[in-house]
Amino acid sequence: MSEVFILYMYRMFWALFLGALLAMGFRRSWNAEHGKMTSWMEDREHAVVWLDPIVFPVMIIFFAAINLWVYGSDDGVEYGLCLLIDIFVFVSVYFTGLMFLLPMLRRRYTARTCAVLWLVPVFLFYQPHMLYLMRSEPPLVVLYLPGILLRVLLAVWAAGFLVLFGTKIGSHIWFSRRLRQHSRPILDPELLEIWEKVRCDLDMHIPVDLRYCSLTRTPLTIGMRKKSKVTYLPERAYGAEEAELIFSHELHHVQRRDTHTKCFLEFCKALGWIHPLVWLAARRAQDDLELSCDEIVLEKADAVTRRKYAELLLSTAGDGRGFTTCLSASARTLRYRMRATVSGGKKKLGVVMLFTVMALSVLGMGKISVSTDRTSLAELIQLSEDSLSEVYLTKDGEEIRISDLERLAGYLSSLQAERLIYTYTLLSEQGGCDLEGITSSDATFRMSGSYVEICYPEKRNPVLCRMKEPVDWQKIQAFE
């Protein structure tokens, strides 16, 4: 059994494993929210699907820092750049595709299912090193960017990311303080009784403060830390049924840690700010968060309650800034939410669909890469006419030793190649012939198909290069 086959099996196992974890996590969350507890569920107050979305930015920064510390500046920066490209490409492609499929998905599956689909990058990249340890095939698509252009684009992207995400964090902190300054505790015994009743119905023990605020026109919840969560209500009178609907909606957001999901979506927007469709997709994802809470609040409601809830959405449309969850934050989606609120209807849970999407995401990640440093193969291998020590050609399972190393070095020097920003473990055979050699500087190389794998003694990870022209294997065989 070859090493490449073992890596394929490990990758398949990892895909099925993550798919199963997502499916089970979603089912556990669904059952917890609906009071269907089992012995392995701790409580109902946490309805997060498997992983808290805040894990996504935290783990990316953590793994980039760890690799920089372990592998040093060169290998660490290359790993971080590869991880960044993989995440940017996956989030851009996945979010764009999901956005176009969303109308069909919303018709067939629950709003909760659609909301969870946006979280697939969280589960995929929570241990990115596992994806690279099991990767053995070259990318299907390679985009060439000259080194200077790549550095300029990275600088522009990094500046945009820091400005956008930094501004969002600053806006969240400022908005949170403003809300606190212009708020007061709710002392109305009837409202507090309804609040405690809804908390008891949801079996929620997370501390959430309840306050009036003169700045907001819509009920909202804010707070990134467990003990800093606050639900703010506009200063007006509330009926008992109206208050119960509002509290149920906001506390379901707290159960799901949707303020963290909002942070994750804003991080993705900043990450893919160059791609306008990522912005649009992130807004659609935020809509699904609200739709999924509407769905569970009205799950057992009659037609009269549904109409009252629709009127509530219409009367409380407002603005939600920072990492907040709002009852009715956007007039842009109000029409769809009101239609979904009034109509109701039975939809599929989609556990198998989530499993399939997760598994395919693992298998499909890393199919697109970026190449740079287009130059001669001799320069990449650090090759000169007398620097080859041993070279072997493998053809049809037969190993042939190349004796005319000077002529081979001359031919290899005439070939053009480009270096890929790509992290993997082992290069699989690309079919046809293989050429393996050692240079006098102890660097090794292996040419297979249109790719060359180079292992430098001073680097811990191999370097993958792509040939810019077909290799003349008959000519190489003539050098034996």
Where are these regions (language model features)?
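Enrichment for repetitive, rod-forming helical segments
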Residues: L18, V342-G344, E453
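Function-determining sites in protein domains
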Residues: S371-E480
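Charged interaction patches that mediate protein-protein contacts
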Residues: M1-I6, G364-S369, I454
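Membrane-embedded alpha-helical segments in integral membrane proteins
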Residues: M1-E3, I60-D75
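Hydrophobic transmembrane alpha-helical segments in integral membrane proteins
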Residues: S2-L21, V77-I87
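Membrane-embedded and juxtamembrane structural elements of multi-pass membrane proteins
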Residues: W30-V58, Y71-M134, L140-I368
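Short, compositionally biased low-complexity segments
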Residues: A65-I66, V163-I173, Q382-L393
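Basic/hydrophobic alpha-helical interface regions
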Residues: A20-H34
